[in-house]
Swiss-Prot record:
Binds to the 50S ribosomal subunit and prevents its association with the 30S ribosomal subunit to form the 70S initiation complex. The keyword Protein biosynthesis applies. It comes from Thermococcus kodakarensis (strain ATCC BAA-918 / JCM 12380 / KOD1) (Pyrococcus kodakaraensis (strain KOD1)). GO terms for biological process: assembly of large subunit precursor of preribosome; cytosolic ribosome assembly; maturation of 5.8S rRNA; maturation of LSU-rRNA. GO terms for cellular component: cytosol. Pfam families: eIF-6. It comes from the Archaea. Keywords: Initiation factor, Protein biosynthesis. GO terms for molecular function: ribosome binding; translation initiation factor activity. This is Translation initiation factor 6.
Amino acid sequence: MHIERLDFENSPYLGVYGRATDRVLLLREGLGEKKLEVLREVLKVPIIETSIMKSRIVGIFAAGNSNAIIVPWYIWDAELERIKTALNEFGIDMDVVPFKSRLTALGNLILTNDKAALVSKEFTREEANAIGEILGVDEVERGMIASYRSVGSVGVVTNKGGLVHPEATDEELEWLSDLFGVDIYVGTANMGVPFVGSCMLANSYGVVVGHLTTGPEIVKIEEALGFLG
């Protein structure tokens, strides 16, 4: 199964609490084994349970792709060591890089797959270039989606497709498609929520959406992320 509905302690905002890549899922601590098993089955990657800066909102703080995970500079040493140790135990050769910036909500401010990264205009040009180097992408741009600077919360992109805020223009969709090298659609989740990045955990193998997501929304999400046809 490549798509499932789930809640985290009755919250439908799964993307707030985790960061999925094609190699690993960083996830908040304290979820039951049944939910972890659903995530493993759908996303098909190992799970590393952790906090970041003693907080459960791992998806807001962490961004990443198959090459690297970027975390705030202020991550606790024990948390960073836990993530690195777990990656090593799983046999995953992947960088985890604390990023020195006044900004900490990196997951909300960075949208990336393995080809490219779109970062918020809140970052300087120098910071954007540094993020691109860490993520090992071919291209990095500063920009907005549908007039929102929090590009990571209003979008989801994988190596197979992407979904963004329904107010994104046709010109933005074309630009994003060229940047990321995949088709980009508009849509919502959790009964009309436009901040799709906060509503789901997705990679190239599957997607787990908030439990309030409707049938028509699921069809659009499947299409956008390359799971139809």
